[in-house]
Regions:
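Intrinsically disordered, low-complexity terminal regions
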Residues: 1-253
């Protein structure tokens, strides 16, 4: 009797394994044509995108062949648009794009997937994220302008430049890591800013929403609070200017 039970369990396990193997999605790879003029990337749909610096411009897509066929990539001058014409449910992580570019000036995403950017440097980088996706940036630019809407997340790390100009108007969160001469942040939504690990000489915060912010300022801190959120300032700046017209508060650490 025990042998029959064991054989039954083994057979059931084998059929389950075969079912999983047969159900495993097919993965295909495509190389799409682009050239080195591309310095701006606009992303939409359900694509995980990785952008890295390299001497030759290339774009490689991978994923289910049915979804690859509905992934649209169009270059218009210096701008590359990536979108998916997919209706219905798509599992996150099922579509991947590997993009290599010599230079980069702008990344704009309305995707629900993740976007990673690394290895670039230059004068100015413009970032925009709307929706429920995520963006992780590890680059070295003199000036970084970043805008976050929706419920997504943005992580800017290894920063080392003149300044960062941040606009947070959604319910997501932003983390900054590195240093710069100045940080300017306009926080008007429900989201939060964690810049404790971002050392700035001067910090200028306009907070009109419900979110909270943590920043590090070593010389100047100019804070204007008109919402319900609060600001925590590290670094013991010598020059402090605070205006509070709401329920928020300022803490010095």
């Amino acid at each position: 009797m025990n042998k029959l039970v064991k054989l039954g369990l083994a057979a059931a396990g084998l059929w389950a394994w075969l079912g999983m193997a047969l159900a495993a999605p097919e993965v295909a790879t495509e190389t799409r044509p682009i050239d080195a003029r591309v310095v701006r990337v606009k992303l939409d749909g359900a694509v995980d995108l990785r952008i890295r610096q390299g001497s030759t411009a290339t774009l490689i897509l991978s994923g289910d062949p049915r979804w690859l066929a509905k992934t649209i990539t169009v270059q218009s001058g210096d701008t590359l648009n990536i979108d998916t014409d997919i209706h219905g449910r798509v599992h996150l992580g099922a579509l991947h794009a590997e993009l290599t570019l010599p230079a980069l000036r702008e990344v704009s995403s309305e995707s629900v997937g993740s976007t990673e950017v690394s290895g670039f440097s230059g004068e100015e980088l413009e970032l925009s994220l709307d929706g429920a996706g995520s963006m992780r940036i590890s680059c070295n630019y003199k000036l970084v302008s970043a805008s976050l809407g929706g419920v997504g997340s943005m992580h800017l790390q290894s920063l080392s430049g003149e300044g960062v100009d941040l606009n947070l108007h959604g319910a997501g969160f932003v983390t900054l890591n590195g240093r710069a001469k100045w940080l300017k942040a306009d926080l008007g939504g429900l989201g939060s800013l964690d810049a404790r690990e971002f050392a700035a000489d001067s910090v200028n915060i306009e907070l009109s929403g419900l979110g909270n912010a943590s920043v590090t300022a070593h010389q100047n801190a100019n804070l204007n609070l008109s919402g319900m959120g609060s600001v925590t300032v590290y670094g013991k700046p010598l020059n402090r200017k605070v205006a509070v017209d709401g329920l928020g508060k300022v803490s010095w650490k």
